Amino acid sequence: MYRLYWLDEHNPRSPFPPAEQAMDEPNGLLAVGGDLSPVRLEQAYRRGIFPWYGPGQPILWWSPDPRCIFRPGWLHVSRRLARRLRTGAFRMSLDTDFTGVISACAAPREDQAGTWIVPEMMHAYEALFELGIAHSVECWDRDGELVGGLYGVALSGAFFGESMFSRRSDASKACMAWLSAQLHRWGFALFDCQVSSPHLRRMGAVDVSRSRFLAQLQQALVLPHRRGPWRFDRDLDPVAIHRQHQTRTTAPEVLYGS
């Protein structure tokens, strides 16, 4: 019988149990407690583990099976999204307003009872941003209003998406497309989305087993690390990059492993 592992909140370097020991129900719950220090968070991400909990709960650590991922540069860009990206409806930026993005992601939504991005979580990722490990993508309209964004953590050749928001149609999709294209150009090997959703699957995300994800993560972690702040390349064309890959018929098992 599996026993839930309790982490020492006074020792951020105390080890996590192997991700393979996560519970089946609830899917992926691995450990409780600890802290949200940069040392602890980096250790978690390197092991395929992330924090996710609500107000009034202790810190909960997860590694679900299966895992939802993209291969950078292989998102599905619809014709409608391609038109939005090429007409100049949005202005995109990287690492320009991290606090604005995470605050918008934490705001209550109509389809949710509450938010899991509690204040201590926000402060923890803002600390990672100051260290150049966490990053944000911003989507601005023509009036200069922040209308979409996402944030996540980058270690070596792996990017771990945490949350995104959209106040205009296609704004969060634009963030995904631009970030995926830039990660592809930089040679990133893995874009982790944690848990699958219909929205992510429509954009080309796939579910892989936890064991496959952990193997791909270890391969990505040997690649060079790119510390922030990041900026988009001036000549980046996300539509061209993704369309180039969409014209190929590469099977998912070739892209992501069987």
Swiss-Prot record:
TM region(s), chain numbering: none
One GO term (biological process): protein catabolic process
Subcellular location per the Swiss-Prot or TrEMBL entry: Cytoplasm
Database matches in SUPFAM superfamilies: Acyl-CoA N-acyltransferases (Nat) (SSF55729)
Main location: cytoplasm
One Pfam family here: Leu_Phe_trans
One Gene Ontology cellular component annotation held by this UniProt entry: cytoplasm
Alphabetical keyword list: Acyltransferase, Cytoplasm, Transferase
Broadest EC class assigned to this enzyme: transferase
Catalytic activity: N-terminal L-lysyl-[protein] + L-leucyl-tRNA(Leu) = N-terminal L-leucyl-L-lysyl-[protein] + tRNA(Leu) + H(+); N-terminal L-arginyl-[protein] + L-leucyl-tRNA(Leu) = N-terminal L-leucyl-L-arginyl-[protein] + tRNA(Leu) + H(+); L-phenylalanyl-tRNA(Phe) + an N-terminal L-alpha-aminoacyl-[protein] = an N-terminal L-phenylalanyl-L-alpha-aminoacyl-[protein] + tRNA(Phe)
EC number: 2.3.2.6
GO molecular function, a single term: leucyl-tRNA--protein transferase activity
Similarity section: Belongs to the L/F-transferase family.
Chain's role: Functions in the N-end rule pathway of protein degradation where it conjugates Leu, Phe and, less efficiently, Met from aminoacyl-tRNAs to the N-termini of proteins containing an N-terminal arginine or lysine.
This protein's name: Leucyl/phenylalanyl-tRNA--protein transferase
Protein species of origin: Alkalilimnicola ehrlichii (strain ATCC BAA-1101 / DSM 17681 / MLHE-1)
